[in-house]
Regions:
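Short, acidic/polar
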Residues: 1-4, 40-44, 87-94, 142-145
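Structural motif
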Residues: 4-7, 49, 98, 130, ...
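Hydrophobic faces of well-ordered beta-strands that scaffold small-molecule active sites
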Residues: 8-12, 37-39, 52-54, 82-84, ...
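Conserved, mostly hydrophobic/aromatic
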Residues: 10, 46, 95, 103, ...
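An accessory alpha-helical subdomain
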Residues: 17-21
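Alpha-helix-loop-beta-strand connector modules within alpha/beta enzyme cores
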Residues: 23-41, 65-87, 116-143
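Glycine-rich phosphate-binding active-site loops on the catalytic face of alpha/beta enzymes
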Residues: 54-70, 102-118, 140-162
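Internal catalytic-core helix/loop-beta-alpha segment
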Residues: 76-109
Length: 162
């Protein structure tokens, strides 16, 4: 299996490219990577991926009733992987009633895209204990960070470039 440095899951995130650019990117990634490919927020790209990661604001665009929102999303993606961003214990408890495959939890540390005001650090690890879903720690996570249960994955973005 071709993976990038033993990376089993890769999330594609491109907030600014055109739909055609994103499709071309995903096709290129598919040629070089056969691990699980997740897209961020872009339902229109689901045919090119193994799953969808969605944020708190984006899920509410489907319905303010999160159970109903996930039902609507599942109608479109079927049993492909579905993940949801969470930031605190309250959102984790909400997510427990949803048909998800994992949650992203963060931000762990400040980054250029996540301000100090949104950072939870070690308190997030305590919050993660309440999740019935596998938890991926996100936001300021580096290759050198290590986590134990209840954290199942570390999600590295800008930390790849340090």
């Amino acid at each position: 299996m071709k993976t990038f440095n033993n990376v089993p899951i890769l999330q594609y995130r491109n907030k600014f490219g055109s739909l055609e650019e994103k499709k071309a990117d995903l096709l290129t990634i598919r040629e070089q990577y056969d691990g699980t490919l997740i897209i961020n927020d872009s339902m229109e790209l689901i045919a090119y991926a193994d799953g969808l990661h969605i944020g708190q604001d984006d899920i509410r665009a489907y319905s303010d009733d999160l159970v109903e929102a996930v039902k609507q999303i599942r109608l479109k993606i079927g049993r492909k992987v579905l993940g949801l961003s969470t930031h605190n214990k309250e959102e984790i408890l909400e997510a427990n009633s949803l048909d998800l495959d994992y949650i992203g939890l963060g931000a762990y540390r400040a980054t250029h895209t996540k301000s100090e005001a949104n950072v939870g650090g070690k308190t997030l690890i305590e919050a993660a204990k309440h999740s019935k879903h596998p938890v991926g720690m996100i936001g300021g996570v580096t290759l050198d960070d290590t986590f134990e249960e209840p954290i199942h994955y570390k999600v590295i973005g800008s930390g790849l470039y340090l």
